[in-house]
Curated annotation (Swiss-Prot):
Chain segments annotated as transmembrane: none
Annotated Gly residues bias: 92-115
Name used for this protein in its record: Cold-inducible RNA-binding protein A
The organism of origin for this protein: Xenopus laevis (African clawed frog)
Tissue-specificity statement: Initially localizes to the animal half of the late blastula embryo, then to the neural crest and neural tube from late neurula stage through to larval stages, and finally in the neural tissues and developing pronephros of tailbud stages. Expressed in a range of adult tissues including kidney, brain, lung, liver, heart, muslce, stomach, small and large intestine, and skin.
Length: 166
């Protein structure tokens, strides 16, 4: 229930920190939490964050008022965290739950996708092993090629063909 007042803030300037974000949103109501998501290794902002309001109506007001506005020189996107935004950004979530590699590969666009895709197919077919392993390997090679050739949301197609290998 506490997530109802939580907003996803995308498109942040990499210099924007929690204090800047709080200043931009505090005029819409009492804020219980502000988080700018940072890269685990470099500790730099990843360009998005979350603002949680104590009151759901305040969060909705802030979302309507701030979506598309400029913060620290960058136009931001404001969406409700979880429900509606989760469905729209399902590609990221689906990829990360399918295997952490797909999430990172998806961000790489192209080479990264194929690298992660092929290793997942190879590991899987190797697990079923035996003499059919070589046939599965070539099958995944074809699938990987078509996966790499199609761009944009094609990982779902790969999952469909992936299911037929099992």
């Amino acid at each position: 229930m506490s997530d109802e007042g939580k907003l996803f803030i995308g498109g942040l300037n990499f210099e924007t920190n929690e204090d800047c974000l709080e200043q931009a949103f505090t005029k819409y109501g009492r804020i219980s939490e502000v988080v700018v998501v940072k890269d685990r290794e470099t500790k730099r902002s990843r360009g998005f964050g979350f603002v949680t309001f104590e009151n759901v109506d305040d969060a909705k007001d802030a979302m309507m008022a701030m979506n598309g506005k400029s913060v620290d020189g960058r136009q931001i996107r404001v969406d409700q965290a979880g429900k509606s935004s989760g469905e729209r950004r399902g590609g990221y979530r689906g990829g990360s739950s399918g295997g952490r590699g797909f999430f990172r590969g998806g961000r790489g666009r192209g080479g990264g996708d194929r690298g992660y895709g092929s290793s997942r197919f190879d590991n899987r077919s190797g697990g079923y092993g035996g003499s059919s392993g070589s046939r599965d390997y070539y099958g995944s090679g074809r699938s990987q090629g078509s996966y790499g050739d199609r761009s944009g949301g094609s990982y779902r197609d790969s999952y469909d063909s992936y299911a037929t290998h099992e």
